[in-house]
Each structure stands twice: as structure tokens, then as C-alpha cells.
């Protein structure tokens, strides 16, 4: 049986700000984009959460819920530096580290000999080191499999940890909500509920053939997770799957021409990001995303092995066909990265310059 720890920093961006600026402590604080530029909340303090403020919420709505909210723009470079320090702490206990983002990671400590191999004590030690060296608190989940470690890390927040032992696993998963399983979003959860499936226990006694017929690959995953099975190991060389850029507009726009005026800046920024982080990666698709005034969004993608500026404009036109008279508040573009090594950024740079020169 493996010993997996999921470490999740507590309201990370906001916590860094409160550490560096003590005047923010104990107050409702959020990191995110401004109301004037129609930004969204990246994260917020627990004091702000008491008012209902949440990540990914429109900043304007957050202020309606909490008029005294303190909003700061964020300092990404600082967050990255602290994250590297935290990752160095992880490496003292195991080389098997899978970062999920700046503020969370999986660790496999199955072979760790410290603390007599106790994953519970190792997690406590990691959290102590993080607090002592960075001034930040972390929560942890410990379990024999990845998805349950992630679930567990959320059960004793903030600054706590929760252990699911192999002996606890069968009973724990029976009552676990299907919404906690990665890959089960709002729409899928509603479909499952319509079938009378709300917990892993419900799936355990449901027809496997019916699940596979209705949900395909996700059905197979549901069957495994409902029985506490997750064969995924720690991916220490986890590759980036995509590179993208998007902009939230100061005011809603409505026409194709207005959207097209946004594109050159996005394309230039995408070219820059590709050259920095994926210059030796081959692409397999291009994507355009629009978010409308009702906060619903649509994406259009096309499989391709060569970046084409013209294709981005074609996809934009297709996406706009789904507008239904709604205003557009966000435009985004991205490329999906394949697992090969062909230089792609210079192509985009060249095409971008040609397009902008026309």
C-alpha cells in the first residue's frame, strides 16, 4: 500500500500578503483583478470567506457581499519564489513530488525512512517546516491513493491534516460524495443525481454496464474511485498540457470586429509565453474561448500540428456564432501541447508579425 500526502497551502496568495503586510491580518482580504477592469478573485482570506467571497468570483460581486473587502492585485513573482522554497522542503523527505500548482502538491513517502516511515508524522513535520521557514500554514491529507489524499486535505482546514488509513478506506468511500471525485463537474453531478447516484456507495451497487454505457471512460473511473481504487502514481516529470492567454475586457463588446481588435495583443503575448515555457514542444490543437456577460463561456478548438494565426481568427468567428446577443466580457486563446519536441514558438512569432503588419 502506498503512502500519499497531498499538501495544500491555506488561502496561499492571501496568506503571503498577510504575512508581508501585517495590517491585513484578521481582515477580509482578496487577491484579484479590480472592479474597474471587471476582474475576478484569485483567492481570499478566511475572513472574506465568511461573507461568501470565493475564488473565481467576479470582483464586483465580491464587493457586494463584503463592502469592506481589501483588494490587492497580487505579486506572482513572490508567490513563485515562496513556492520554490516550499518545494525544497518537500524534497527533504522524498524525491517523488508532483506539483499541481504553486500552492499544492502530491508526495509519495512510501519509501521515506524518517519518523519510522509514518506518513502522518512526516506530514506534520513538513507542515512544521513550512510554518517555521515561510510563516505560512498548510493543510495535508494522507491516504493510500491520490484522489483520497486530496479529498482528505480539505477535511481539517486550515492548518490541519486528516488521515485515511487502509482500514478506514472501505467505509470512508461509501459515504463520499461523487462531487469530490476529480472529473465530476456540475453537469456530470446533475446527471448522476438524476440516476439516484450521489455517493460512492450508490455507484458500488449500480449497474457497471449502465455506467459505462452512459459515461464511457468517466464511467470506468467512477467505478474505480467508488471502490477506493486509484492506480495513478506520482508524476515527477509532469508536463504542461497547454499554454494560453486571456483578457477580461473593461466593457462588454458585441461585434466580430471588436473581438478581432483584441486578438493581436493576445497573439503576441501567447507567442512570448510559448517562447519562454514551451519552445521545444509540438502542438496538437488551437483553442479560442469566449466568456459572455452572463458568465457562461464557450470554447472552440481545432486539431492542428502547426500554429496558425488565421486559424485563431476562424475559431473566433465560430465561437461568436454562439453569442445569442450576449455581451462578451472575456476573450482567450491557447494551444494544446503534445508530448513531442518540435519548435513552435518561432513560427507563431513570424506569423504574428506578418499579420500585424497587414
Curated annotation (Swiss-Prot):
InterPro entries: DNA/RNA_pol_sf, DNA_pol_Y-fam_lit_finger_sf, DNA_pol_Y-fam_little_finger, DNA_polymerase-Y, DNApol_IV, IMS_HHH_1, Rev_trsase/Diguanyl_cyclase, UmuC
GO biological process: DNA-templated DNA replication; error-prone translesion synthesis; SOS response
GO cellular component: cytosol
Gene3D superfamilies, alphabetized: 3.30.70.270, 3.40.1170.60, 5' to 3' exonuclease, C-terminal subdomain, DNA polymerase, Y-family, little finger domain
EC number: 2.7.7.7
Residues the record lists as binding Mg(2+): 8, 103
Active site: 104
Reactions catalysed: DNA(n) + a 2'-deoxyribonucleoside 5'-triphosphate = DNA(n+1) + diphosphate
GO MF annotations in UniProt: damaged DNA binding; DNA-directed DNA polymerase activity; magnesium ion binding
Keywords: Cytoplasm, DNA damage, DNA repair, DNA replication, DNA-binding, DNA-directed DNA polymerase, Magnesium, Metal-binding, Mutator protein, Nucleotidyltransferase, Transferase
Record-linked CDD domains: PolY_Pol_IV_kappa
Cofactor(s) required, per the database record: Mg(2+)
Subunit structure: Monomer.
Annotated PANTHER family: DNA POLYMERASE KAPPA, DNA REPAIR POLYMERASE UMUC / TRANSFERASE FAMILY MEMBER
Protein name as annotated: DNA polymerase IV
Gene name of this polypeptide: dinB
Amino acid at each position: 500500500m502506498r503512502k500519499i500526502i497531498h499538501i495544500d497551502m491555506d488561502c496561499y496568495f492571501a496568506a503571503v500578503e498577510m504575512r508581508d503586510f501585517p495590517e491585513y491580518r484578521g481582515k477580509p482580504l482578496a487577491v484579484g483583478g479590480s472592479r474597474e477592469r471587471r476582474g475576478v478573485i484569485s483567492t481570499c482570506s478566511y475572513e472574506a470567506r465568511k461573507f461568501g467571497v470565493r475564488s473565481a468570483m467576479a470582483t464586483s460581486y465580491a464587493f457586494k457581499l463584503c463592502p469592506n473587502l481589501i483588494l490587492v492585485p497580487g505579486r506572482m513573482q513572490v508567490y513563485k519564489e515562496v513556492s520554490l522554497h516550499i518545494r525544497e522542503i518537500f524534497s527533504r523527505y522524498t524525491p517523488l513530488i508532483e506539483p499541481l500548482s504553486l500552492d499544492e502538491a502530491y508526495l509519495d513517502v512510501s519509501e521515506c525512512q524518517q519518523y519510522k516511515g509514518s506518513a502522518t508524522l512526516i506530514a506534520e513535520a513538513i507542515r512544521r517546516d513550512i510554518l517555521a521557514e515561510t510563516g505560512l500554514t498548510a493543510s495535508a491529507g494522507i491516504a493510500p491513493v491520490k484522489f483520497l489524499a486530496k479529498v482528505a486535505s480539505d477535511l481539517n482546514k486550515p492548518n490541519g491534516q486528516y488521515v485515511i488509513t487502509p482500514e478506514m478506506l472501505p467505509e470512508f468511500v461509501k459515504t463520499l460524495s461523487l462531487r469530490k471525485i476529480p472529473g465530476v463537474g456540475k453537469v456530470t453531478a446533475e446527471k448522476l443525481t438524476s440516476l439516484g447516484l450521489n455517493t460512492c456507495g450508490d455507484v458500488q451497487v449500480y449497474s457497471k454496464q449502465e455506467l459505462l454505457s452512459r459515461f464511457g471512460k468517466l464511467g470506468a473511473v467512477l467505478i474505480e474511485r467508488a471502490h477506493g481504487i486509484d492506480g495513478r502514481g506520482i508524476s515527477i516529470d509532469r508536463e504542461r498540457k497547454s499554454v494560453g492567454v486571456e483578457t477580461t475586457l473593461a466593457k462588454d463588446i458585441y461585434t466580430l470586429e471588436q473581438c478581432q481588435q483584441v486578438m493581436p495583443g493576445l497573439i503576441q503575448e501567447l507567442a512570448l509565453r510559448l517562447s519562454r515555457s514551451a519552445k521545444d514542444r509540438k502542438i496538437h490543437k488551437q483553442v479560442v474561448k469566449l466568456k459572455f456577460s452572463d458568465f457562461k463561456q464557450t470554447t472552440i478548438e481545432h486539431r492542428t500540428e502547426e500554429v496558425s494565426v488565421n486559424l485563431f481568427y476562424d475559431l473566433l468567428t465560430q465561437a461568436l456564432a454562439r453569442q445569442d446577443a450576449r455581451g462578451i466580457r472575456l476573450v482567450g486563446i491557447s494551444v494544446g501541447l503534445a508530448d513531442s519536441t518540435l519548435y513552435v514558438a518561432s513560427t507563431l512569432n513570424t506569423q504574428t508579425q506578418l499579420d500585424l503588419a497587414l
